[in-house]
């Protein structure tokens, strides 16, 4: 049997892994509901599936489970306020937030980098969380202008910033920066 893991140490160590920030939304009983979520991932291309992991005591999860549908909103680096609001205990998280309904009726938050509209495919036990598989029903196009994603690392927001030694025309084009090869490239 392994030694007892200290929860703060566990959280701190896992904080070394940088994640994107999403807001998972639905509408239940005609009320928009959502929460900030870092535990989101692609699961399968065929069939198209994603997953996220809400806490078992989440009221937002209860609304998503009851509605049977949800929309994943991928946040941009300019949406820290949106992330903070949906990560709070604020009772009306949608106050002052512009959104429109997805094809399934879940909120798409204006200004998000991308959205993925899903139905709940299955729910699995994950300790103090559930692991929710979502069947992708529709999704946004890739934006022509590519804003940078909002990231979370070591308990704080962060972003993608190319090294200053990267040529200026590549620093201004995130996609070029991410696919540029140098003598140190592993590929």
From Swiss-Prot:
Induction context: Induced by KstR.
Oligomer and partners: HsaAB monooxygenase consists of an oxygenase component HsaA and a reductase component HsaB.
Note: Cholesterol metabolism contributes to the survival of M.tuberculosis in the host by helping the bacterial multiplication during earlier stages of infection and to the dissemination of the pathogen in the host.
Gene Ontology molecular-function annotations: flavin adenine dinucleotide binding; flavin reductase (NADH) activity; FMN binding; oxidoreductase activity, acting on the CH-NH group of donors, NAD or NADP as acceptor; riboflavin reductase (NADPH) activity
Chemical reaction(s) catalysed: a reduced flavin + NAD(+) = an oxidized flavin + NADH + 2 H(+)
EC number, as in UniProt: 1.5.1.36
Function in brief: Catalyzes the reduction of free flavins (FMN or FAD) by NADH. Subsequently, the reduced flavins diffuse to the HsaA oxygenase subunit.
Keyword Lipid metabolism: yes
Protein name: Flavin-dependent monooxygenase, reductase subunit HsaB
Listed GO biological process terms: cholesterol catabolic process; steroid biosynthetic process
Pathway recorded for this protein: Lipid metabolism; steroid biosynthesis
Matching SUPFAM superfamilies: FMN-binding split barrel
Sequence similarity: Belongs to the non-flavoprotein flavin reductase family.
UniProt xrefs under SMART domains: Flavin_Reduct
Gene3D superfamilies per the UniProt record, alphabetical: Electron Transport, Fmn-binding Protein, Chain A
Sites where the protein binds NAD(+): 152-155
Keywords: Aromatic hydrocarbons catabolism, FAD, Flavoprotein, FMN, Lipid degradation, Lipid metabolism, NAD, Oxidoreductase, Steroid metabolism
Residues given in the record as FAD binding sites: 32-36, 38-39, 53-55, 59-60, 85-86
NCBIfam families, alphabetized: monooxsub_HsaB (NF045630)
């Amino acid at each position: 049997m392994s030694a007892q893991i200290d929860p703060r140490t566990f959280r701190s160590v896992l904080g070394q892994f940088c994640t994107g920030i999403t807001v998972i939304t639905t509408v239940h009983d005609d009320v928009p509901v959502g929460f900030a979520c870092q535990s989101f991932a692609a699961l399968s291309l065929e069939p198209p599936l994603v997953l996220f992991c809400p806490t078992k005591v989440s009221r937002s999860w209860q609304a998503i489970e009851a509605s049977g549908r949800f929309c994943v909103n991928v946040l941009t680096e300019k949406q820290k306020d949106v992330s903070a609001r949906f990560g709070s205990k604020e009772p009306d998280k949608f106050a002052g937030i512009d959104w429109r309904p997805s094809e399934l009726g879940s909120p798409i938050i204006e200004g998000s980098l991308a959205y993925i509209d899903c139905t709940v495919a299955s729910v699995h036990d994950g300790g103090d969380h559930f692991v929710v598989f979502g069947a992708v029903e529709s999704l946004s196009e890739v934006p022509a202008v590519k804003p940078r994603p909002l990231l979370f690392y070591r308990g704080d927001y962060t972003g993608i910033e190319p090294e200053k030694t990267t040529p200026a025309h590549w620093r201004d084009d995130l996609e070029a920066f991410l696919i540029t090869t140098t003598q140190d490239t592993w590929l």
